[in-house]
């Protein structure tokens, strides 16, 4: 993998990330294909209509079903899903966190109960890489120890703050330990001829504790990861705490490597964190919101189910050139949604993902032109009316 920063504008960066399967302009948004498909779309949609260069697949879900060995028999994710561009696979740590009622973390890894059949499994720093070697993704994420955050940590009582601090410190200690195990194992596997075209990213934990983030970032930057991710945000904390944490940790992340903010987020979150130096994003929001009838536009969000769109002949966004907006009206989409027609999911998902990918293109162009601040002002000015 090769990463090069081509242009900076303040802390915002425009660059290019090259894997064995695609050349990716950054900052980039990665659509989420949890079980090997972006919901309601196929590889042709992703490649030919949206021109997506990289998508995310989930190690936890692919491990449980159909199993990474099955995927390997098809030639990895690229052969199985027929998407011949890049894949990033997360480690499954977030899914274990989200299912924490059935999960137990210890010094060796994460023990969890399958949401499918109740069977018991144990993820370790090595086992999640073994799964990802079989998936043959371009970018693999290490196992990390995630902490649930309160919306406002400053509002906690003294005892609650002490408990949270203790848990965050444990998370950082474990994450650093697991990172060392992962990078050593990856070097060993590559020396044996495995994963030669696969890259490995470390994940920085530490909650909203700046000192903990600094410790974790500095430790992981000393390891030869191909990229570094900021994990453990957008898990309950208010947006301002997310932005402050990203801003605080950035000086301690190697500028020569791509920076990935995991699970984020809204268009506003993306703009704010690009300004702080983030290169890569992923989130289920564009497709999840699409299925629920919330569509993104340059001017805000549309709840397409609303009655005022029944006779609306306009496209979702008059400024949008996506597949859906060039063909269909708000009135038609309103009808499809109300009729529970499955076609709606595809058309709405194509639109929302186009919106996100086009937003990234506009951001890259603004950074390259040295006009990111102007772009940000216009972005917020157009959206000041809120939901349409």
Curated annotation (Swiss-Prot):
Protein origin, superkingdom: Bacteria
A molecular-function term among this protein's GO annotations: metal ion binding
GO biological process, one term: queuosine biosynthetic process
Keywords from the UniProt entry: Glycosyltransferase, Metal-binding, Queuosine biosynthesis, Transferase, tRNA processing, Zinc
Pathway in which the depicted protein is active: tRNA modification; tRNA-queuosine biosynthesis
Quaternary state and interactors: Homodimer. Within each dimer, one monomer is responsible for RNA recognition and catalysis, while the other monomer binds to the replacement base PreQ1.
Name the UniProt record assigns to this protein: Queuine tRNA-ribosyltransferase
Gene: tgt
């Amino acid at each position: 993998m090769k990463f090069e920063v081509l242009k900076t504008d303040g802390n915002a960066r425009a660059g290019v990330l090259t894997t064995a399967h695609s050349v990716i302009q950054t900052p980039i948004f990665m659509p989420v294909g949890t079980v090997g498909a972006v919901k309601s779309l196929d590889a042709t949609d992703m490649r030919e209509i949206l021109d997506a260069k990289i998508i995310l697949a989930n190690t936890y879900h692919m491990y449980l079903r159909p199993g990474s060995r099955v995927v390997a028999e098809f030639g990895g994710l690229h052969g199985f899903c027929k998407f011949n561009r890049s894949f990033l696979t997360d480690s499954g740590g977030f899914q274990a966190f989200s299912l924490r009622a059935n999960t137990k973390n210890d010094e060796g890894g994460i023990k969890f109960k399958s949401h499918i059949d109740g069977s018991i499994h144990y993820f370790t720093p090595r086992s999640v890489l073994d799964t990802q070697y079989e998936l043959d993704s371009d970018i693999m994420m290490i196992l990390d120890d995630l902490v649930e955050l309160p919306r406002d940590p400053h509002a906690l009582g003294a005892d609650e703050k002490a408990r949270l601090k203790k848990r965050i410190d444990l998370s950082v200690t474990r994450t650093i330990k697991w990172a060392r195990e992962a990078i050593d194992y990856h070097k060993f596997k590559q020396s044996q001829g495995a994963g030669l075209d696969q890259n490995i990213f470390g994940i920085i934990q530490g909650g909203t504790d700046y000192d903990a983030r600094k410790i974790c970032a500095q430790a992981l930057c000393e390891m030869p990861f191909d990229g570094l991710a900021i994990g453990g945000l957008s898990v309950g904390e208010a947006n301002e705490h997310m932005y402050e944490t990203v801003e605080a940790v950035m000086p301690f992340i190697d500028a020569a490597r791509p920076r990935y903010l995991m699970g984020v987020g809204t268009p506003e979150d993306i703009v704010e964190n690009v300004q702080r130096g983030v290169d890569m994003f992923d989130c289920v929001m564009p497709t999840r919101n699409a299925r629920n009838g919330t569509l993104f536009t340059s001017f805000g969000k549309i709840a397409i189910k609303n009655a005022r769109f029944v006779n609306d002949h306009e496209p979702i966004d008059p400024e949008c050139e996506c597949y859906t907006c060039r063909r269909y009206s708000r009135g038609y989409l309103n009808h499809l949604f109300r009729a529970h027609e499955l076609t709606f999911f595809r058309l709405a998902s194509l639109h929302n993902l186009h919106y996100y990918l086009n937003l990234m293109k506009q951001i890259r162009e603004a950074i390259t032109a040295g006009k990111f601040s102007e772009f940000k002002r216009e972005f917020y000015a157009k959206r000041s009316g809120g939901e349409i």
